[in-house]
Amino acid sequence: MRWLFWASPPQNDSHDASPNAHPRPIKPQRREAHQDHTPAPGQAAPEPTISNAQSSRDWNSSLNATDWKQFTEPKTIIPTALLTGGILLCVHIHRKYLRRIPEAGYISPSYFRRRSLLGKVTSVGDGDNFRLYHTPGGRLGGWEWLRKVPTGKNELRNRTIHIRLAGIDAPELPHFGRPAQPYSHEAHTWLTNYLLNRRVRAFLYRPDQYGRVVATVYVRRWLLFKQDVGLQMLKQGWATVYEAKTGVEFGGAELERKYRDAEAWAKRRGLGLWEGLKGKKKEKWESPREFKTRMAAEEAQRK
């Protein structure tokens, strides 16, 4: 039955009863997420797609990758070698020349007869020995303007080197129960005025049985002229040449000759302790070595 012309058309043409009506084709929905990407036989496989997360990882890994070749290039090797060598050189210089030695027991055997110590005299104990505060590098090492030398007894305790002047023997002050030898105070006073609070250089020879270091010592008194302290004591007549069967140390045959000539010169003029050889005093005069020998014999008899 035909619809009247004023009637509304049918809701769905697919329900048209006309036998000649053809059904409208239905378009398939796109479901890309569920499509099977398996290639057909004879067909090439599609290229995989790169996600954003994977591309980010590749970019970060390329940034963090280490290029080991750059460490073998001259522009890297040369500065590194120079820096390392400079550091090792500074450490070597500090250990060999700028390290302070607190006491005689810390002196390496390699120093004896090869090295010298620069320091300041803090006290004079006798006519032939004193205490030295080691100041490595001197003024170039900052001493006296950046680094101060201690002055108090507590500050200097266990921090000074006991030096024994080589090649000479001065009159003994009273100690160990022994009386003072004639001219001992005069010799001690002269050496104190000559050395105390002055910078000296000591050329080390060996340690002695009392924990001291036997050394030839030089001091600058006038301008740039350095003077041998032991030689000056001999010239002034406040010491004699060291005489003993063993343990005699002069620092060489040349120094020994100078010392003996200086002693003979002062003896002829009757300077210092040699004044006792004049007139009636000659019978009572004895050298520092003779005094020590007599004291040792008397102590042995008392035992």
From Swiss-Prot:
List the residue ranges of the region (Disordered). 1-59, 281-303
Q: Which residues does the UniProt record annotate as the domain TNase-like?
A: 115-276
The entry's Ca(2+)-binding residues are D169
Pfam families per UniProt: SNase (PF00565)
SUPFAM superfamilies tied to this protein: Staphylococcal nuclease
Q: Which residues cross the membrane?
A: 77-93
**What SMART domains does the database record attribute to this sequence?**
SNc
Q: Where is the composition biased (Basic and acidic residues)?
A: 283-303
Q: What EC designation does it have? A: 3.1.-.-
The membrane topology of this protein is: Single-pass membrane protein
Molecular function as annotated in GO: endonuclease activity; metal ion binding
List of catalytic residues: R164, E172, R212
**Feature: compositional bias, Polar residues:** 49-59
What PANTHER family does the annotation carry?
EBNA2 BINDING PROTEIN P100 (PTHR12302), SERINE_THREONINE-PROTEIN KINASE 31 (PTHR12302:SF3)
Query: Would you tell me the protein name for this molecule?
Result: Probable endonuclease LCL3
Q: Which organism is it from?
A: Uncinocarpus reesii (strain UAMH 1704)
- Gene assigned in the entry: LCL3
